[in-house]
Amino acid sequence: MKFYASGLLFDNDGVLVDSHAAAADAWAIWCSEYAPQVNWDDPKHAGQRAEDKVREWISSPDLFEVANNRINELEQLTAHTTIALPGAVDLTSSLRDGTWTVCTSANPNLGRARLLAAGLPVPPQLVTAADVKLGKPHPDPYLLGAERLGFAPEDCVVFEDASAGVAAALA
């Protein structure tokens, strides 16, 4: 049986790169400062935009911007420790431009920094948290990724590891 797809849409963290230790360190510090009641390492939080998690955990609108800026700062400081998952460099370097992209829940700077730290190319069609109104589990990131590649969503395959991303891909 053969399967054909026009476009390949990859999540980044956990699919192409391993940033778990760096993210865990950043979120542990952030939670100790802003939300000590939160167990950030719970898998249900994986794959979602930091801004959405901060909004969920910080009830004060006045504190949201400060808290959101802080997690962005902490994650950026640890991005350089990101490594490529086995086979990711060979895979992405073998794909033709315009046939694949990354749809990440990270902000633009963090998404690029993690890809570059891992030695992976940054696709021109990169989709980040800032590009969509609704992040995963909503389908917006993957719909935009397909659109940027010029393909119908049903002609694309999504590679995803987090339940929020799988829900986005299936929506």
What is each stretch, according to the model?
Residues 82-86, 136, 160:
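Conserved phosphate-coordination/catalytic loops
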